[in-house]
């Protein structure tokens, strides 16, 4: 059970049987229920406990089971830490551009209802980048692209958008041994291509002529300059990039440090705006009825099995081994650093002895010599 005086997700869900009341009023996917209830039990003593022993100094420790769900603020942060290390390990040592591809709020309810279309957004981003490079004379260059689907904004509203990490340049298709630098990303082409290809692919995926008249035509009419794309942020090294993107992408829906008020009926939290206006970075406080707050948190859980992160071009999994060897030869990738970061990433998940630092093992597996 959560501590009575702290404002945590667990406390809000447990308090006054809010969660039981919530599921009693709605039809909810069983996988979503399982994730939420795992989060509510995460780290509880004494029900969810495993005993460990250090094989070196025989120190005994009890550790609570962890749920490892995305919704959990503790496990979500642990995943974020591990993912930041993984990003630093896998990214090539070249300058990347951090881009954000958005869609108008009028399409959000449609994308919320048809969650199988989320993959369409991810695939379309890479298609846009390919066509943009072709338009600007870089069609013989293969970039590295990692796309991350993000279903919500900092205000917890459903706001589907895609973060893309794009190498500023790529390898030539013919030889695959020469790196070509590219620093110019034309906003006008990006925005219009993103609008056109996304709406086209949306209609193709739904196979519904109604989509053309209710979504496609109004969007072309209203957004004549295309959909908004932010592509101004350059990131210079892999370590900075890993931390930079995790801050926006891989974290839990809301950090508990942002929960600043709860009285049993209402929840207050804050966020900082991120846009191109003069209000960028401004703190905004939001107060919601507790059931509405729970509904927002639950609605952000992705469908079971959906891959939020996808790799394209030089980062695609079927080219990964070959490209790494080429990038090593060009001094854009370091095998020694990869080994070091692999070891560091393993530490995130290991249970280490508080006395000697040795990896602990489950007590039932211990055989004293």
Predicted regions and their residues:
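Beta->alpha loop/short-helix hinge microenvironment recognizer with preference
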Residues: 1-369
């Amino acid at each position: 059970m959560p501590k009575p005086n702290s404002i945590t997700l667990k406390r809000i869900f447990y308090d006054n049987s809010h969660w039981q009341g919530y599921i009693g009023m709605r039809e909810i996917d069983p996988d979503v229920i399982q994730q939420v209830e795992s989060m509510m039990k995460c780290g509880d003593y004494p029900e969810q406990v495993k005993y460990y022993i250090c094989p070196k100094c025989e120190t005994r420790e009890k550790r609570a089971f962890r749920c490892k769900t995305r919704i959990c603020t503790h496990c979500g942060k642990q995943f974020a830490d591990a993912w930041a290390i993984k990003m630093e390990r896998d990214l090539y040592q070249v300058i990347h551009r951090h881009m954000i591809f958005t869609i108008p709020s009028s399409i959000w309810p449609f994308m919320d209802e048809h969650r199988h279309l989320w993959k369409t957004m991810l695939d379309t981003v890479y298609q846009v980048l390919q066509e943009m490079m072709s338009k600007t004379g870089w069609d013989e260059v293969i970039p590295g692209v990692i796309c991350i689907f993000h279903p919500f904004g900092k205000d917890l509203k459903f706001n589907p958008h895609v973060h893309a990490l794009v190498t500023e340049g790529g390898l030539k298709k013919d030889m695959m041994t020469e790196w070509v630098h590219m620093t110019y990303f034309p906003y006008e082409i990006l925005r219009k291509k993103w609008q056109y290809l996304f709406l086209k692919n949306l209609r193709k995926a739904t196979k519904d002529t109604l989509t053309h008249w209710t979504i496609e035509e109004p969007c072309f009419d209203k957004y004549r300059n295309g959909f908004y794309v932010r592509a101004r942020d350059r990131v210079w090294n892999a370590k900075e990039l890993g931390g930079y993107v995790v801050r926006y992408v891989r974290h839990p829906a809301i950090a508990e440090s942002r929960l600043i008020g709860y009285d049993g009926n209402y929840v207050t939290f804050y966020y900082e705006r991120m846009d191109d206006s003069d209000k960028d970075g401004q703190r905004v406080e939001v107060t919601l009825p507790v059931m509405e707050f729970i509904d927002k948190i639950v609605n952000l859980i992705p469908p079971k099995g959906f891959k939020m992160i996808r790799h394209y071009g030089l980062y695609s999994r079927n080219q990964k081994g070959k490209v790494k060897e080429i990038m090593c030869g060009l001094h854009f990738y370091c095998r020694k650093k990869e080994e070091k970061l692999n070891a560091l990433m393993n530490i995130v998940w290991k249970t280490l002895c508080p006395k000697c630092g040795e990896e602990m093992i489950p007590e039932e597996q211990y055989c004293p010599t």
